[in-house]
């Protein structure tokens, strides 16, 4: 399971012209599920996201986590983060999970995150979405449950 994590001042997502999720200070996550992912991968990613220290303390050091600052999360399903563009000019998505498995693990991840974080908003799985992000920093971190990076 993989996530592009962006620290934001605010973020929102629109589907079919309607706003379906909005957060203030916190993290926007673009989440992809791999073929071989399990609930353990989702658990790992959930713990990492909730406790990742990428918020600044009073000395401007990254010492505070999402939970420390009472931040919010916008989770966007995005199979393209599983893309492999090392060869050729078109990304290969052969490592991305099939729809049913991806949706099940994505929903599992969101529910686990809701147990830790005060506010979690989501896009719509497999929908075309317009995601607006006001980056804070910018601070962007890549996470992978297989620890590829």
From Swiss-Prot:
Check the record and name the InterPro entries matching this protein: Daa-tRNA_deacyls_DTD, DTD-like_sf
The record's Pfam families line, in alphabetical order, gives: Tyr_Deacylase
Q: Which GO terms describe its cellular component?
A: cytoplasm
Tell me the compartments it is located in: Cytoplasm
Q: What is its main location?
A: cytoplasm
Q: Reply yes or no: does the keyword Hydrolase apply.
A: yes
Q: Name one GO molecular function term.
A: Ser(Gly)-tRNA(Ala) hydrolase activity
Query: What SUPFAM superfamilies does this protein's entry cite?
Result: DTD-like (SSF69500)
Per the Swiss-Prot or TrEMBL annotation, the motif Gly-cisPro motif, important for rejection of L-amino acids is positioned at 137-138
- Highest taxon above the source species: Bacteria
Q: Which GO terms describe its biological process?
A: D-amino acid catabolic process
Q: Which UniProt keywords apply?
A: Cytoplasm, Hydrolase, RNA-binding, tRNA-binding
Give the first-level EC class, as a single word: hydrolase
In short, the EC number is 3.1.1.96
Q: Which reaction does it catalyse?
A: glycyl-tRNA(Ala) + H2O = tRNA(Ala) + glycine + H(+); a D-aminoacyl-tRNA + H2O = a tRNA + a D-alpha-amino acid + H(+)
How it assembles, according to the record, is: Homodimer.
This chain's function reads: An aminoacyl-tRNA editing enzyme that deacylates mischarged D-aminoacyl-tRNAs. Also deacylates mischarged glycyl-tRNA(Ala), protecting cells against glycine mischarging by AlaRS. Acts via tRNA-based rather than protein-based catalysis; rejects L-amino acids rather than detecting D-amino acids in the active site. By recycling D-aminoacyl-tRNA to D-amino acids and free tRNA molecules, this enzyme counteracts the toxicity associated with the formation of D-aminoacyl-tRNA entities in vivo and helps enforce protein L-homochirality.
What is recorded about the domains? A Gly-cisPro motif from one monomer fits into the active site of the other monomer to allow specific chiral rejection of L-amino acids.
Instruction: Provide the family line.
Output: Belongs to the DTD family.
Q: What is this protein called?
A: D-aminoacyl-tRNA deacylase
Task: Please name the source species.
Answer: Caldicellulosiruptor bescii (strain ATCC BAA-1888 / DSM 6725 / KCTC 15123 / Z-1320) (Anaerocellum thermophilum)
